[in-house]
From Swiss-Prot:
GO molecular function terms listed in the Swiss-Prot or TrEMBL record: thiazole synthase activity
One GO-annotated biological process of the protein: thiamine diphosphate biosynthetic process
InterPro entries listed in its UniProt record: Aldolase_TIM, Thiazole_synthase_ThiG, ThiG
Organism (species): Parasynechococcus marenigrum (strain WH8102)
GO cellular component, one term: cytoplasm
Protein name per its UniProtKB record: Thiazole synthase
């Protein structure tokens, strides 16, 4: 069942997460870019308003992250600290707390957002459902606005929503794989049952897949690798931004219902006889 879309896509069709309003439904990342300058150009051309930052990499000044905090205009871009690299709930909670302090250093005193990642498997990078739920419950109790990265599991998504998460973020396919929406059927179930925004995260490789996610009724997408590893990252960022607008507009317009049989678009009455 496809969720009922808004009647029209008006100026007020903004995305609200944790009480904060976003015009853009594309979120981007900060990793894998060939240079800081390319990252800056890509963020600008994407027109995104929220960017995720790997707290552990910034804290350790990992390769490609030196100068990151100074490279982004945090008066315009909302920081989404993430717990990438954490393998269990305890680690994720500690890193989330560091992320909150990082946001404060960027001048965002009221930023409680965290993209929660608990990933014990370094090969496939699939999230741990039990650890994610445990960490989410703790972080919600501490006042965080939790955006959990999960497998496309409708039951887990509902448990996280019930725990107080501000969104759920099901993966389309494994991180960085570019395989697209391999889990479209389960994502559709999550969208149908969710009372919080659904953000498709991971696996999107091309703009058409971002558009597809929005056409399905997802509220937003998070795209990093497909932009950062493109031949022209800034151009791909712009294309992703346009695709998200197109997908959301199409969803709001309402798709043609699927039919078992053909239906002629030309009139069948009043035909000129031969």
């Amino acid at each position: 069942m496809v969720p009922n879309p808004p009647i029209s896509l008006a100026q007020g069709d903004d995305l609200i997460i944790g009480g904060r309003r976003f015009h853009s439904r594309l979120f981007t990342g900060t990793g894998k870019y060939p240079s800081m300058e390319v990252m800056q150009q890509s963020i600008k051309r994407s027109a995104c308003e929220m960017v995720t930052v790997a707290v552990r990499r910034v804290q350790a000044v990992a390769a490609g992250h030196a100068g990151l905090m100074e490279a982004i205009d945090w008066t315009r871009i909302w920081m989404l600290p993430n717990t990438a690299g954490c393998t269990n709930a305890e680690e994720a909670v500690r890193v989330a707390r560091l992320g909150r302090e990082l946001a404060k250093l960027a001048g965002q005193e009221d930023n409680t957002f965290v993209k929660l990642e608990v990933i014990p498997d370094g090969r496939h990078l699939l999230p741990d459902p039990i650890g994610t739920l445990q960490a989410a419950e703790q972080l919600v109790n501490e006042g965080f606005t939790v955006l959990p990265y999960i497998n496309a599991d409708p039951l887990l998504a509902k448990h996280l929503e019930d725990a107080g998460c501000a969104t759920v973020m099901p993966l389309g396919s494994p991180i960085g794989s570019g395989q697209g929406l391999n889990n479209a059927a389960n994502i559709a179930l999550i969208i149908e049952n969710a009372s919080v925004p659904v953000v498709v995260d991971a696996g999107i490789g091309v703009p058409s897949e971002a558009a597809q996610a929005l056409e399905m009724g997802a509220d937003a997408v998070l795209v990093n690798s497909a932009i950062a590893l493109a031949r022209n990252p800034a151009a791909m960022a712009e294309a992703m931004g346009q695709a998200v607008i197109a997908g959301r507009t199409a969803f709001c317009a309402g798709r043609l219902p699927r039919r078992e049989e053909a239906s002629a678009s030309s009139p069948t009455t009043g035909l000129v006889s031969s």
